[in-house]
UniProtKB/Swiss-Prot annotation:
It comes from Xanthomonas campestris pv. campestris (strain ATCC 33913 / DSM 3586 / NCPPB 528 / LMG 568 / P 25). Coiled coil: none annotated. It comes from the Bacteria. Its EC number is 5.3.1.8, 2.7.7.13. InterPro entries: GMPP_N, Man1P_GuaTrfase/Man6P_Isoase, Man6P_isomerase-2_C, ManC/GMP-like_b-helix, Mannose-6P_isomerase_type2, NTP_transferase_dom, Nucleotide-diphossugar_trans, RmlC-like_jellyroll. The gene is xanB. The keyword Disulfide bond does not apply. This is Xanthan biosynthesis protein XanB. The keyword Isomerase applies. The lineage of its organism: Bacteria, Pseudomonadati, Pseudomonadota, Gammaproteobacteria, Lysobacterales.
């Protein structure tokens, strides 16, 4: 295979799949279809055609999740580029292209959103092979999905005559239903997948031609970025100065070298709970589920949850259960969950952004109970991991070890605690928690005080650069 370098775009917030997908843990990090997360599945399907480990473009807040999920697959990415603020796909791909050419190479960039489902991986890989041949000739390739219905939620691409990689005649905005029906009947149009393949230098060349402001801002953001062992943090001010634009508007609609390669591979962008039903294994009545679910005399329903969900006599209904929220909606209106999230945000509620269980680079914590002046958390610390040296102005903490071994720094003391042992951290005392063992550390934390927010943390030292 050609010199293909996957660029995985992982900056989305995924609120259309609330309450499972939230800003703090969006859908690309969830195993919605199969055992792997969508980010992991994106790499696994591209690996057979890749000559390099991927470059991942992610939000600062999601950096550890992206790194850890690739690490679970035994993959060390070529780079993880951190956007200080989302500026759409054209700038994200620009900084990835600059990174790809950093050491003098000029690979073919296979640009992939991290949150798509593709059922037929062999067909996808065959399409990449066709696209690579065109990209080697200087073309900018987009993958067009053969439409199966008159969808009004996708943009369309009109292709020229021919087979394989054919010239793009035009890009079309999301049409109304009648127009979409005409597109489907004509056989000349494809859904715009948001996946691309081109030489890194060709993309940068066309971007400089058509959107020099984006190219200049991204050059400065990349050159001024700060690198450590795992991440490259783009220069905040320079990247923020870039116009926010998609690759479609910035380059693909303007270049004379755009071609489209058809892709018929069971593609879905999983943009709603209804579309997740479409890509899930269904019973004879069109029902699908994930978890412990009973669907009695139901048709075309979808359920997702960890606790037992029982549905009786329902049609076209979606039920999603999490620890702190339940969504119930009609399949035809489930996309309106975005309005629900907006209302929750407006009310100042944490459920819009945070799960009850919050993942950190050192492990996770689950807020299992909360009341006036107290909160109870179940904390899990990975083997060898260390939390920051910190203190709190407004709360004291009690720690009880459930399993594993805890090394506790409390002021000038260092304690070693094992199962069924506990300690007390007074308000205002510096403290730190470490798991020195080879097994996960599990403990119960009881907080008490006048204010229990996560922003009442003063960090003095931190392994993960959060001071």
């Amino acid at each position: 295979m050609s010199d293909v370098l996957p660029i995985i775009l992982s900056g989305g917030s995924g609120t259309r799949l609330w309450p499972l997908s939230r800003e703090s843990y969006p859908k690309q990090f969830l195993p919605l279809v199969g055992e792997h997360s969508m980010l992991q599945a994106t790499w696994l399907r591209s690996a057979p055609v890749a000559a390099h480990a991927p470059i991942v473009v992610a939000n600062e807040e999601h950096r550890f999740m992206a790194a850890e999920q690739l690490q679970q697959l035994g993959v060390k990415p070529s780079a993880i580029l951190l956007e200080p603020k989302g500026r759409n796909t054209a700038p994200a791909i620009a900084v990835a292209a600059l990174e790809a050419t950093r050491n003098g190479g000029d690979p073919l960039l296979l640009v992939l959103p991290s949150d798509h489902v593709i059922r037929d991986e062999a067909a996808f890989q065959a399409a990449v092979t066709v696209a690579a041949a065109a990209a080697e000739q200087g073309k900018l390739v987009t993958f067009g999905i053969k439409p199966t219905a008159p969808e009004t939620g996708y943009g369309y691409i009109k292709a020229g005559v021919g087979t394989g990689a054919t010239a793009v005649e035009r890009f079309v905005e999301k049409p109304d239903l009648a127009t979409a029906q005409g597109y489907l009947a004509s056989g000349e149009y494809y859904w715009n997948s948001g996946m691309f393949l081109f030489r890194a230098s060709r993309y940068l060349e066309e971007l400089r031609k058509f959107q020099p402001a984006i190219a200049d801002a991204c050059q400065k953001a990349w050159e001024g970025g700060k690198r450590d062992a795992d991440f490259t943090r783009l220069d905040k001010d320079a990247f923020a100065s870039s116009p926010s634009d998609s690759i479609d508007y910035a380059v693909m609609e303007k270049t004379a070298d755009a071609v489209v390669v058809p892709l018929d591979a069971g593609w879905n962008d999983v943009g709603s709970w209804s579309s997740l039903l479409d890509v899930s294994e269904q019973d004879g009545q069109g029902n699908a589920h994930h978890g412990d679910v009973i669907q009695l005399d139901c048709k075309n329903t979808y359920a997702y949850g960890s606790r037992l969900i029982a549905m009786v006599g329902l049609e076209n209904v979606v039920v999603v259960e999490t620890d702190d929220a339940v969504l119930v909606g009609h399949r035809d209106r489930i996309q309106e969950v975005k309005e629900v999230v907006s209302q929750i945000k407006s009310a100042g509620r944490s459920e819009a952004t945070w799960h009850r269980k919050v993942y950190r680079p050192w492990g996770a914590y689950d807020s299992i109970d909360m009341g006036q002046r107290f909160q109870v958390k179940r904390i899990t610390v990975k083997p060898g991991a260390t939390l920051s040296l910190q203190m709190h102005h407004h709360r004291a903490e009690h720690w009880i070890v459930v399993s594993g071994t805890a090394e506790v720094t409390r002021g000038e003391e260092v304690l070693l605690l094992t199962e069924n042992q506990s300690t007390y951290i007074p308000l205002g005392v510096t403290h730190r928690l470490k798991n020195p063992g080879k097994l996960p550390l599990e403990l119960i934390e009881v907080q008490s005080g006048s204010y229990l927010g996560e922003d009442d943390i003063v960090r003095f030292e931190d392994t993960y650069g959060r001071t």
